[in-house]
Amino acid sequence: MRHALPSASVTDEIPGFPERFPVRDDGTRSWRYKAVSLLCRASLRGFFGRGLQLDSMSKFPAEGPLLVVCNHLSNIDPWIFGGFGPGALYCMSKRELFSNPVVSWILAGCNCFPVDRGAADRRALRTALDVLSRRGRLLIFLEGTRSSTPGMRRAEAGVGFLARRSGASILPVGVWGTEAALPRGHRLPRRVPIRLKLGPVFELPERLPGERRDDQAVADLIGSRIAELLPPAYRGVYAAVDTPAAIPSLR
């Protein structure tokens, strides 16, 4: 079944945000993106030092379409991708972050676009599909919001929708330690070890367990691939999920 999505602008009258989000075809980064990336990288390395352990970003495919899907534990998580993610990444960000016109303008320059987490935001989905149709690389957090515990929450079905509809390759990413570095409700970070691990890029198989291939089943499959990258204490609802034995790998 094909889902009809509106072709309207990405958002309604957010001060500082362009009426139509500029999705670029050439993979270049704006000066705002470069400046924020440098700030993120310098801040994280300066504060956490060798405690910040990241897999080689050379595992990122140079071209899309690519869905980069990660579990979400802390507000530090997007900073890591902003500072160390190679090339240009696009990212869905909660609409509340765009309440300030200046912040909204900066986020737009960093390839971030708003999503309303309280509803099925079709405009955000349309923008995400536009990014992927132009062979872009889109970062999305699996659970849609920060987990209140280290263990993974169930994936949002929208992740499965984007994977199915776009046909993009998928890069699973696992992060842990950020929940201790900047817990929910805290304003100042703590110096603790942080680990980010990249999994192998894969494509959706033709069949899923039980013959299911709906949005939630696809999202759960991606969740199980992320869980494989995490220590057992962080796998949450995916601790006992059976993963298909073989998924066609692109790497």
Could you say what each language-model-derived stretch is?
Residues 62-119, 127:
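Catalytic core of membrane glycerolipid acyltransferases/transacylases, capturing the structured
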